[in-house]
């Protein structure tokens, strides 16, 4: 099964509102790519509105009022899940953004960390699997079925191994990128995600 974030809420009385004078910092994360999108603040009313409307709403410290992200631009954040940290004084919000989150037109208010593109690629492959746009190589792979996709993974694996032995670094990187892409497609064709494979790696590491 694909690792879909579970919708969850937090209970207001369980949170430590006193530490921040009635405000809690809120880290917003893309529910699909897991990229951190922004930091905001919520009071209890903002949290209630967020849970009720399913649109992420903050408390503006400068304007001294509630504001729903994207209320003017339309670039709202659709709530998927809310969790508190171990001290109950910080919230992690998983959301699906409609458009860029940053007011500068960027996906995130923070620069992308190396490796984060894999999450975005996994989400894009999932979108291709759902929507099947024409003239898409990914769509063509899905329509050929699991056997063909698995065959491509095998071919790319062999080419990557050969590049690692007898070719230059650029060739090895190119083949590695092809292998990763086709592996993500294979996982999606089986109803799985890259996150599922990462979960297995994490379990082995413990």
From Swiss-Prot:
The keyword Nucleotide-binding applies. GO terms for molecular function: ATP binding; phosphoribosyl-AMP cyclohydrolase activity; phosphoribosyl-ATP diphosphatase activity. GO terms for biological process: L-histidine biosynthetic process. CDD domains: NTP-PPase_HisIE_like (cd11534). It is an enzyme of class 3 (hydrolase). Pathway: Amino-acid biosynthesis; L-histidine biosynthesis; L-histidine from 5-phospho-alpha-D-ribose 1-diphosphate: step 2/9; Amino-acid biosynthesis; L-histidine biosynthesis; L-histidine from 5-phospho-alpha-D-ribose 1-diphosphate: step 3/9. Residues 1-117 are annotated as: Phosphoribosyl-AMP cyclohydrolase. Pfam families: PRA-CH, PRA-PH. Keywords: Amino-acid biosynthesis, ATP-binding, Cytoplasm, Histidine biosynthesis, Hydrolase, Multifunctional enzyme, Nucleotide-binding. It catalyses: 1-(5-phospho-beta-D-ribosyl)-ATP + H2O = 1-(5-phospho-beta-D-ribosyl)-5'-AMP + diphosphate + H(+); 1-(5-phospho-beta-D-ribosyl)-5'-AMP + H2O = 1-(5-phospho-beta-D-ribosyl)-5-[(5-phospho-beta-D-ribosylamino)methylideneamino]imidazole-4-carboxamide. GO terms for cellular component: cytoplasm. It is found in: Cytoplasm. Its main location: cytoplasm. Its EC number is 3.5.4.19, 3.6.1.31. InterPro entries: His_synth_HisIE, HisE, PRib-ATP_PPHydrolase-like, PRib_AMP_CycHydrolase_dom, PRib_AMP_CycHydrolase_sf. It comes from the Bacteria. Residues 118-206 are annotated as: Phosphoribosyl-ATP pyrophosphohydrolase. HAMAP family: HisE (MF_01020), HisIE (MF_01019). In the N-terminal section; belongs to the PRA-CH family. In the C-terminal section; belongs to the PRA-PH family. This is Histidine biosynthesis bifunctional protein HisIE. It comes from Xylella fastidiosa (strain Temecula1 / ATCC 700964). The gene is hisI.
